[in-house]
């Protein structure tokens, strides 16, 4: 029987919900989070197409995926409720019910760094140097690299931080700062 570890998926879902709550505030409502197929393949160590991934997540298909789907729902439902998954092409939607959003709000610690980052980049005139200073305030092990792809200006990340493994990519647009964060494997897929 195939065995998958849902910890990375669950952690990613919780991290995105926390980030959304830092940006918009907490509301007890449904949330739909979208992931490309490549991210799911990274989470599960697979290399399957969209339809097979849907079968894996549903517990149907050529192989007996029923235990896999049951394991996913068991792993996620105690915290996030009954997560529904659908896809259109290579884009997967994870529908988190209100009780899952409430669980994250009530039972996880606020990510202070994300809250401060969201507040900082919302400030008119925020600079890359201010962003870098925020990173160094939270850790002495920070890396920064320029990006020369025309889409983003700089990538900053915490080195060897299991709690925050993301690459944060920033773009200065006049007086505004935008950012995207990626898990390292997803970042590599984008070939920045």
Where are the regions a protein language model picked out?
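Positively charged, polyanion-binding regions of nucleic-acid-associated proteins
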Residues: 2-33, 43
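Charge-rich, solvent-exposed alpha-helical interaction surfaces
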Residues: 12, 16, 43, 71, ...
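Alpha-helix boundary/N-cap detector
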Residues: 1-12, 35, 63, 67, ...
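Residues within mature, well-folded domains
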Residues: 109-192
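Charge-enriched amphipathic alpha-helical scaffolds
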Residues: 31, 41-84
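Short glycine-rich, basic-tinged beta-strand/loop micro-motifs
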Residues: 26-48, 113-119
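Charged low-complexity interaction tracts in eukaryotic proteins
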Residues: 67-109, 150, 154, 158-161, ...
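Surface-exposed polar/charged interaction patches
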Residues: 16-23, 59, 63, 75-78, ...
């Amino acid at each position: 029987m195939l065995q998958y570890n849902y910890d990375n998926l669950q952690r990613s879902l919780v991290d995105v919900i926390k980030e959304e709550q830092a940006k918009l505030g907490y509301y007890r409502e449904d949330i739909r989070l979208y992931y490309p197929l490549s991210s799911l393949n990274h989470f599960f160590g697979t290399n399957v197409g969209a339809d097979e991934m849907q079968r894996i997540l549903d517990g149907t298909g050529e192989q007996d995926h029923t235990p896999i789907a049951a394991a996913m729902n068991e792993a996620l439902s105690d915290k996030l409720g009954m997560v529904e998954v659908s896809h259109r092409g290579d884009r997967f939607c994870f529908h988190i019910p209100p009780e899952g959003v409430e669980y994250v709000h009530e039972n996880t610690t606020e990510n202070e760094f994300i809250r401060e980052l969201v507040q900082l980049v919302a400030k008119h005139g925020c600079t890359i140097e201010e962003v870098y200073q925020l990173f160094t305030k939270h850790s002495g092990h920070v890396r920064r690299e320029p990006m020369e792809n025309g889409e983003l200006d700089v990538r900053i990340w915490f080195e060897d931080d299991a709690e925050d493994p993301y690459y944060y990519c920033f773009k200065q647009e006049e007086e505004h700062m935008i950012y995207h964060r990626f898990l390292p494997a997803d970042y590599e897929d984008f070939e920045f």
